[in-house]
From Swiss-Prot:
This is MFS siderochrome iron transporter B. GO terms for biological process: iron ion transport; transmembrane transport. Residues 105-127, 178-187, 237-246, 324-334, 394-409, 457-463, 520-575 are extracellular. It is found in: Cell tip; Cytoplasmic vesicle membrane; Cell membrane. InterPro entries: MFS, MFS_trans_sf. It comes from Aspergillus fumigatus (strain ATCC MYA-4609 / CBS 101355 / FGSC A1100 / Af293). SUPFAM superfamilies: MFS general substrate transporter. Changing W247A: Decreases the uptake of triacetylfusarinine C (TAFC). Residues 55-78 are annotated as: Disordered. Residues 1-86, 149-156, 209-215, 268-302, 356-370, 431-435, 485-498, 597-612 are cytoplasmic. GO terms for cellular component: cell tip; cytoplasmic vesicle membrane; plasma membrane. Induction: Expression is repressed by iron. Residues 60-72 have a biased composition (Low complexity).
Length: 612
């Protein structure tokens, strides 16, 4: 175990050094935009969105002005969190900007992907993977809008620290859980925390980069995945062999504060520097806990809307996964009650937001912009499609293709490795052309093509190389989706609304992930179990429930035995139907891309200070 734990820091150090060196080269090529040389937007561009044109018109100044007092100070009228990050970027140096943009950690995600199936199996909950995903994704999605308001009102540093706390709490619960409900609760805090960190990181990336360079910035923040995708899978394998899956979560409760607190310190330090330089005037606000401030917080963060949103989607989606194992299927009384109540809560959420909420959960100004709406729907559709088949992929590779944990992790993490290369390539194309919509027209059919091939190849007896080939197709298209939908929503708003519009995008993605997990769970429970019942030999029937609920039990049967062959056949039958569902949903992507305007981000600017 000591050997395994020593893997992380060495790889992390190498990753940071390599990423910093790469970013230095990036700066030497791209250059750093001085505070006084902000790029001017193209006022003649007919594709400029209505939201952006209305909000940014007064903020734009000529690029060739010798002095620009507006660029020297944060935006007037901006919220406190926006003013703080603009002040930070106006005061920090090139070295800290490089350091900040390269400090990323993907190691824990690689380990989590490999360990999750074993953790749930220890509670006989392997078949409930999608149930846990539904709850955690919906709860994670419900915090993005309040998180956006917190980032704008309080600051990026404070939001980052809060999400770090949730991460650590979730990791502790996961590592110490003794039953499935505790593990599920840990998953909720884990997804809320790391989802919030990811969201905060994306907001910070938007804060310190211009739109034309944002693709390159995202590519460089993905560079550590070249190391963590392999090292994380290997570390997870060694933990399972020599220790326990619990250390795969527990170690991060120790490591994460060491990695995260310097980022908070960096932001807080430069905020103080900005205050000393007079770039930011410190604002005072009474945060004492009184009935008035509590009521203000409830309304400002729309907690009733959050509860209706989270409760409605969780209660509505769970029955589709649970129905197959209910006594009377969809005719079971509690299944009917959950679907009815969940749908009622979702409808109530819509009416509450339109008619009652003083500060709505969703900003309807964004939803009437066709580019923002198209990008959000494309992201949601992509997440639905992906999670239709992804939840049981690591288990499938180990049971059907007889891969060990590390090798299965390498295949599963193909996305992380390939995305860096193609994000960099797509980033350069966007920087050169200023356009991104045409790239989406290429990637949507590529993703569907990969899914179609996977329906054929992801079957028992196939060649693993074809699986990897299809994963590469997914990775190329999927990574570009993530980049382009972010560019689309960011290009449609000004800096004041960056956090809010990214929150909307993340919410739609979380809804898509939860819907995809519900579809995956419904297919799994209605096909995998029935095929086991049909094909298992009589000698294995007493262990049907254990086989269905535990990955180690499935792997315990020798390859070629009648029981293992029945399990393999059931996996292939279920996976094909999951992929068919994912392919069918992704066809909607053509409609959503068609909705988006062909924006040119080459001459747009949103940010101030030492940005790239």
């Amino acid at each position: 175990m000591l050997h395994v734990l020593s893997v992380g820091p060495s790889h992390a150090a190498f990753t940071v050094e390599a990423a910093m060196a790469t970013m230095k080269k990036f700066h030497s090529i791209v250059g750093e935009k001085p505070a006084q040389d902000a790029e001017a937007p193209s006022v003649d561009d007919p594709n400029v969105g209505q939201i952006r044109a209305d909000d940014k018109e007064a903020a734009h100044a000529p690029a060739n002005a010798e002095t620009n007092n507006e660029e020297a100070n944060p935006s007037d009228g901006a919220q406190a969190g926006v003013k703080k990050i603009e002040a930070v970027t106006l005061s920090w140096t090139r070295g800290t900007a490089i350091w900040f943009l390269t400090l990323v950690n993907d190691f824990r995600l690689s380990m989590y992907t490999s360990l999750n199936a074993y953790a749930t199996s220890s509670f006989l909950g392997h078949s409930l993977l999608t149930v846990i995903n539904i709850v955690s994704y919906v709860m994670g999605g419900s915090v993005y809008i309040p998180m956006a308001k917190a980032l704008d009102l309080w600051g990026r540093a404070e939001g980052f620290l809060l999400m770090t706390f949730f991460c650590i709490l979730g990791l502790i619960l996961l590592a110490s859980s003794q039953n499935l409900p505790t593990y599920c609760a840990g998953q909720v805090f884990y997804k809320v925390g790391f989802g919030g960190l990811s969201y905060t990181w994306n907001v910070l990336a938007a804060d310190v980069t211009n739109l034309r360079n944002r693709g390159l910035a995202f590519a460089f923040t993905s560079s550590p995945a070249l190391i963590s995708a392999f090292a994380g899978s290997k570390a997870a394998s060694d933990l399972l062999a020599h220790s326990t899956w619990r250390w795969g979560f527990g170690m991060w409760a120790i490591i994460l504060p060491v990695v995260a607190l310097p980022i908070y310190g960096l932001l807080a330090y430069h905020l103080r520097q900005a205050e000393k330089k007079g770039v930011l005037v410190k604002e005072t606000r009474d945060w004492s806990i009184t009935p008035k401030t509590v009521w203000w917080a409830i309304m400002e963060f729309d907690l009733p809307g959050v509860l209706l949103f989270a409760g409605g989607f969780v209660i509505f989606l769970l029955p589709f996964t649970l129905a197959a194992t209910a006594p009377h299927g969809y005719q079971t009384d509690y299944i009917i009650a959950m679907i009815t109540l969940g749908l009622a809560l979702i409808i109530a959420f819509g009416f509450y937001e339109m008619l009652v909420a003083p500060v709505p959960f969703l900003n309807y100004k964004f939803l009437i912009d066709r580019t923002v709406l198209g990008a959000c729907l494309l992201d949601m559709t992509y997440q639905v499609s992906y999670y239709c088949y992804a939840s049981y992929l690591p288990s499938f590779l180990q049971v059907v293709y007889e891969l060990d944990v590390a090798t299965a992790g390498y295949v599963t993490n193909t996305f992380s490795v390939v995305s860096f290369v193609f994000l960099f390539f797509a980033g350069w194309l966007i920087r050169w052309t200023g356009r991104f919509k045409w790239i989406l027209w290429v990637c949507v059919p590529l993703y569907i093509f990969g899914l179609g091939l996977m329906i054929h190849f992801r079957q028992p007896g196939g060649y693993i190389g074809y699986i990897v080939m299809c994963e590469i197709f997914f990775s190329v298209a999927g990574s570009v989706f993530i980049l382009c939908v972010q560019l689309a929503v960011l290009a449609s708003v000004d800096h004041q609304h960056v956090a809010a519009v990214l929150a909307l995008l993340f919410v739609m993605g979380s809804i898509g992930g939860s819907i995809g997990s519900a579809i995956c769970g419904a297919i799994w429970t209605s096909t995998f179990l029935s095929r086991l019942e049909r094909n298992l030999p009589a000698s294995a029937m007493p262990d049907l429930s254990l086989i269905y609920s535990s990955l180690p039990t499935q792997l315990s049967y020798p390859v070629g035995s009648a029981t293992r062959t029945a399990i393999v056949e059931a996996y292939g039958y279920a996976q094909a139907r999951m992929l068919i569902a994912g392919t069918a949903f992704m066809v909607l992507g053509f409609i959503w891309v068609g909705m988006m305007r062909n924006l040119n981000v080459k001459n747009m600017t949103q940010t101030k200070g030492n940005v790239v």
